[in-house]
Protein backbone atom coordinates (compact mmCIF):
# COMPACT_ATOMS: atom_id res chain seq x y z
CA UNK A 1 0.00 0.00 0.00
CA UNK A 2 1.33 3.42 -0.94
CA UNK A 3 2.25 5.66 1.96
CA UNK A 4 0.11 8.73 2.64
CA UNK A 5 1.63 11.82 4.25
CA UNK A 6 -0.19 14.27 6.53
CA UNK A 7 0.13 18.01 5.92
CA UNK A 8 -1.03 21.16 7.68
CA UNK A 9 -1.80 24.40 5.85
CA UNK A 10 0.57 27.24 6.74
CA UNK A 11 -0.82 29.93 4.47
CA UNK A 12 -2.83 30.64 1.35
CA UNK A 13 -1.83 33.46 -1.01
CA UNK A 14 -3.19 34.95 -4.19
CA UNK A 15 -0.24 35.10 -6.59
CA UNK A 16 -1.99 36.25 -9.78
CA UNK A 17 -5.49 36.91 -11.04
CA UNK A 18 -7.65 33.86 -10.32
CA UNK A 19 -4.58 32.00 -9.01
CA UNK A 20 -3.92 30.74 -5.50
CA UNK A 21 -0.82 29.36 -3.78
CA UNK A 22 -1.07 26.89 -0.91
CA UNK A 23 1.89 26.41 1.44
CA UNK A 24 1.91 23.35 3.68
CA UNK A 25 4.18 21.81 6.27
CA UNK A 26 6.54 19.19 4.84
CA UNK A 27 6.90 15.87 6.68
CA UNK A 28 10.48 15.08 7.67
CA UNK A 29 10.36 11.81 5.73
CA UNK A 30 8.90 13.28 2.52
CA UNK A 31 11.33 13.32 -0.39
CA UNK A 32 10.88 14.36 -4.01
CA UNK A 33 12.83 15.42 -7.06
CA UNK A 34 12.51 18.72 -8.88
CA UNK A 35 9.80 18.47 -11.55
CA UNK A 36 7.75 15.78 -9.82
CA UNK A 37 4.08 15.89 -8.85
CA UNK A 38 1.88 14.40 -6.17
CA UNK A 39 -1.81 13.89 -5.41
CA UNK A 40 -3.11 16.42 -2.89
CA UNK A 41 -6.26 15.29 -1.05
CA UNK A 42 -8.18 17.99 0.83
CA UNK A 43 -11.15 15.86 1.95
CA UNK A 44 -12.22 15.93 5.58
CA UNK A 45 -11.89 12.73 7.59
CA UNK A 46 -14.66 10.32 6.66
CA UNK A 47 -15.31 11.93 3.27
CA UNK A 48 -14.52 10.44 -0.10
CA UNK A 49 -11.31 11.69 -1.63
CA UNK A 50 -11.22 15.23 -2.99
CA UNK A 51 -7.86 15.00 -4.72
CA UNK A 52 -5.95 16.29 -7.69
CA UNK A 53 -2.50 15.79 -9.18
CA UNK A 54 -0.38 18.91 -8.68
CA UNK A 55 3.21 19.71 -9.53
CA UNK A 56 5.32 20.57 -6.52
CA UNK A 57 6.29 24.24 -6.78
CA UNK A 58 8.79 24.20 -3.91
CA UNK A 59 12.45 23.15 -3.91
CA UNK A 60 13.43 19.90 -2.13
CA UNK A 61 15.71 21.92 0.18
CA UNK A 62 12.80 23.98 1.50
CA UNK A 63 11.05 22.90 4.68
CA UNK A 64 7.61 23.56 3.17
CA UNK A 65 5.55 22.20 0.28
CA UNK A 66 4.15 24.71 -2.19
CA UNK A 67 1.36 24.21 -4.72
CA UNK A 68 -0.24 26.71 -7.07
CA UNK A 69 -3.48 26.46 -9.06
CA UNK A 70 -6.00 28.41 -11.07
CA UNK A 71 -9.31 28.93 -9.28
CA UNK A 72 -12.43 27.19 -10.60
CA UNK A 73 -15.72 25.90 -9.20
CA UNK A 74 -14.59 22.26 -8.99
CA UNK A 75 -15.05 20.48 -5.66
CA UNK A 76 -11.28 20.33 -5.20
CA UNK A 77 -10.65 24.03 -5.88
CA UNK A 78 -13.65 25.08 -3.78
CA UNK A 79 -12.35 23.09 -0.82
CA UNK A 80 -8.85 24.55 -1.24
CA UNK A 81 -10.30 28.06 -1.05
CA UNK A 82 -12.19 27.16 2.13
CA UNK A 83 -9.07 25.92 3.91
CA UNK A 84 -7.74 27.89 6.87
CA UNK A 85 -4.36 27.92 8.58
CA UNK A 86 -3.85 24.65 10.42
CA UNK A 87 -6.32 22.67 8.31
CA UNK A 88 -5.14 19.20 7.32
CA UNK A 89 -4.58 17.55 3.95
CA UNK A 90 -2.71 14.52 2.67
CA UNK A 91 -0.38 13.77 -0.23
CA UNK A 92 0.98 10.67 -1.91
CA UNK A 93 4.58 9.88 -2.71
CA UNK A 94 5.93 12.14 -5.44
CA UNK A 95 6.16 10.73 -8.94
CA UNK A 96 7.08 11.79 -12.48
CA UNK A 97 10.35 12.24 -14.35
CA UNK A 98 10.16 15.75 -15.80
CA UNK A 99 13.69 16.91 -15.05
CA UNK A 100 16.81 18.58 -16.37
CA UNK A 101 19.12 17.33 -19.07
CA UNK A 102 22.33 19.21 -18.32
CA UNK A 103 24.56 19.70 -21.36
CA UNK A 104 26.31 22.47 -23.25
CA UNK A 105 22.97 23.41 -24.84
CA UNK A 106 20.93 26.43 -23.84
CA UNK A 107 18.03 25.68 -21.46
CA UNK A 108 14.77 27.00 -22.94
CA UNK A 109 11.47 26.93 -21.04
CA UNK A 110 8.29 27.31 -23.15
CA UNK A 111 5.56 27.70 -20.54
CA UNK A 112 1.93 28.78 -20.34
CA UNK A 113 -0.30 29.57 -17.39
CA UNK A 114 -0.06 27.39 -14.32
CA UNK A 115 2.62 25.32 -16.05
CA UNK A 116 5.06 27.63 -14.29
CA UNK A 117 4.69 25.58 -11.08
CA UNK A 118 7.56 23.08 -11.61
CA UNK A 119 9.73 25.75 -13.24
CA UNK A 120 10.10 27.69 -9.98
CA UNK A 121 12.13 24.94 -8.23
CA UNK A 122 14.10 24.37 -11.44
CA UNK A 123 15.14 28.02 -11.46
CA UNK A 124 15.87 27.84 -7.74
CA UNK A 125 18.21 24.92 -8.41
CA UNK A 126 20.01 26.75 -11.23
CA UNK A 127 20.46 29.71 -8.89
CA UNK A 128 21.69 27.45 -6.08
CA UNK A 129 24.38 25.75 -8.19
CA UNK A 130 25.49 29.04 -9.76
CA UNK A 131 24.67 27.74 -13.23
CA UNK A 132 26.77 29.48 -15.89
CA UNK A 133 24.98 28.39 -19.06
CA UNK A 134 22.29 30.39 -20.82
CA UNK A 135 18.70 30.00 -19.59
CA UNK A 136 15.69 31.51 -21.39
CA UNK A 137 12.13 31.45 -20.06
CA UNK A 138 9.26 32.26 -22.42
CA UNK A 139 6.12 32.52 -20.29
CA UNK A 140 2.77 32.92 -22.05
CA UNK A 141 -0.31 34.40 -20.36
CA UNK A 142 -3.18 36.46 -21.65
CA UNK A 143 -2.36 39.46 -19.43
CA UNK A 144 0.19 40.63 -16.89
CA UNK A 145 -2.41 40.22 -14.15
CA UNK A 146 -2.70 36.50 -14.96
CA UNK A 147 1.08 35.98 -14.91
CA UNK A 148 1.87 33.85 -11.86
CA UNK A 149 5.03 34.78 -9.91
CA UNK A 150 5.86 37.56 -12.41
CA UNK A 151 7.92 39.60 -9.95
CA UNK A 152 9.79 36.58 -8.66
CA UNK A 153 10.59 35.43 -12.19
CA UNK A 154 12.22 38.78 -12.89
CA UNK A 155 14.56 38.50 -9.93
CA UNK A 156 16.29 35.11 -10.12
CA UNK A 157 20.02 35.54 -9.70
CA UNK A 158 21.20 33.29 -12.54
CA UNK A 159 24.14 34.61 -14.54
CA UNK A 160 22.82 34.17 -18.09
CA UNK A 161 19.08 34.11 -17.40
CA UNK A 162 16.54 35.83 -19.64
CA UNK A 163 12.88 36.14 -18.70
CA UNK A 164 10.55 36.79 -21.64
CA UNK A 165 6.90 37.27 -20.60
CA UNK A 166 4.46 37.02 -23.50
CA UNK A 167 1.04 38.65 -23.03
CA UNK A 168 -1.14 37.15 -25.74
CA UNK A 169 -3.92 39.67 -25.17
CA UNK A 170 -1.71 42.39 -26.69
CA UNK A 171 1.24 40.53 -28.27
CA UNK A 172 1.76 37.76 -30.82
CA UNK A 173 2.02 34.29 -29.31
CA UNK A 174 5.37 32.56 -28.91
CA UNK A 175 6.64 32.05 -32.46
CA UNK A 176 9.80 31.13 -34.33
CA UNK A 177 10.76 34.76 -34.94
CA UNK A 178 10.74 35.43 -31.20
CA UNK A 179 12.86 32.34 -30.52
CA UNK A 180 15.36 33.25 -33.21
CA UNK A 181 15.57 36.78 -31.84
CA UNK A 182 16.16 35.74 -28.23
CA UNK A 183 18.13 32.48 -28.51
CA UNK A 184 21.74 32.08 -29.60
CA UNK A 185 20.91 29.01 -31.68
CA UNK A 186 17.47 27.40 -31.86
CA UNK A 187 19.09 24.10 -32.89
CA UNK A 188 21.53 24.00 -29.97
CA UNK A 189 18.96 24.22 -27.18
CA UNK A 190 17.07 21.86 -24.89
CA UNK A 191 13.39 22.83 -24.70
CA UNK A 192 11.04 22.19 -21.77
CA UNK A 193 7.37 22.63 -22.73
CA UNK A 194 4.66 22.84 -20.06
CA UNK A 195 1.08 24.02 -20.40
CA UNK A 196 -2.33 23.06 -21.67
CA UNK A 197 -2.81 20.46 -24.39
CA UNK A 198 -3.43 23.19 -26.97
CA UNK A 199 -0.30 25.10 -25.94
CA UNK A 200 1.83 21.98 -26.08
CA UNK A 201 0.46 21.03 -29.49
CA UNK A 202 1.26 24.52 -30.81
CA UNK A 203 4.79 24.50 -29.40
CA UNK A 204 5.54 20.99 -30.68
CA UNK A 205 4.30 21.97 -34.14
CA UNK A 206 6.48 25.08 -34.00
CA UNK A 207 9.59 23.05 -33.20
CA UNK A 208 8.78 20.28 -35.68
CA UNK A 209 8.14 22.68 -38.55
CA UNK A 210 11.55 24.23 -37.89
CA UNK A 211 13.28 20.84 -37.78
CA UNK A 212 14.21 20.85 -34.10
CA UNK A 213 15.41 17.37 -33.09
CA UNK A 214 12.71 15.53 -31.09
CA UNK A 215 15.38 14.50 -28.60
CA UNK A 216 15.90 18.17 -27.76
CA UNK A 217 12.51 18.81 -26.14
CA UNK A 218 10.61 17.43 -23.16
CA UNK A 219 6.86 17.85 -22.64
CA UNK A 220 4.64 17.97 -19.54
CA UNK A 221 0.88 18.24 -20.07
CA UNK A 222 -1.12 20.35 -17.61
CA UNK A 223 -4.45 19.39 -19.20
Feature names for model-found ranges:
Residues 2-85, 141-143, 170:
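Ferredoxin-reductase
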Residues 3, 72-223:
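FNR/FR-type flavoprotein reductase catalytic core
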Amino acid sequence: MKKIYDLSLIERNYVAENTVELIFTKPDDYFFKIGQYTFLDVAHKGENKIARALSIASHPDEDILRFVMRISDSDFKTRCLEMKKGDSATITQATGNFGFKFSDKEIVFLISGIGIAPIIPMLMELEKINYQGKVSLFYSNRTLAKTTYHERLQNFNIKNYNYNPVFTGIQPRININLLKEKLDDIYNSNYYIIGTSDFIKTMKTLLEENHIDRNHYLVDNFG
